[in-house]
Amino acid sequence: MSKLNKTILADFEAAQIQRQLPEFNQGDTVVVNVKVKEGNRERVQAYEGVVIGTKNAGLNSAFTVRKISHGFGVERVFQTHSAIIDSVEVKRRGKVRAGKLYYLRGLEGKAARIKEDLAAAAQAKAARQAAAKAE
């Protein structure tokens, strides 16, 4: 690809990346509000689970959320800059050491729990309070 095409592509991607989602990592419990179209009406559906992996690739960035629904593990891959994502809310910060948490697929019940990262949660809370004071 020529240098001109690369710069045009980079400019296009920068213009498309407008959404500012909260910072989250693997192990965090998040609620992803997804726009669902049913017939001619549109509604927002919440999908809550643990982030088991992220892929950071500019406009093609994605993250995978896993939840247990009726005893079965369900994973869903969301494109970070997709228009169907209404919002993302971080419920709980997890303390993990691995980059991808695929090992959770083989665990059940209490073994699949993730320890909470209290330091990161306190830091996020302080940042929210500082932002509220600034307004």
From Swiss-Prot:
Domain of life according to the entry: Bacteria
Gene Ontology MF term list: structural constituent of ribosome
GO cellular component: cytosolic large ribosomal subunit
Signal peptide, first to last residue: none
InterPro entries: Ribosomal_bL19, Ribosomal_bL19_CS, Ribosomal_bL19_sf, Translation_prot_SH3-like_sf
Pfam families found in the cross-reference section: Ribosomal_L19
Keywords of the record: Ribonucleoprotein, Ribosomal protein
Gene Ontology biological process terms in this record: translation
SUPFAM superfamilies, A to Z: Translation proteins SH3-like domain
Function (record text): This protein is located at the 30S-50S ribosomal subunit interface and may play a role in the structure and function of the aminoacyl-tRNA binding site.
Family designation: Belongs to the bacterial ribosomal protein bL19 family.
The protein's name: Large ribosomal subunit protein bL19
Lineage: Bacteria, Pseudomonadati, Pseudomonadota, Gammaproteobacteria, Lysobacterales
Recorded name of the encoding gene: rplS
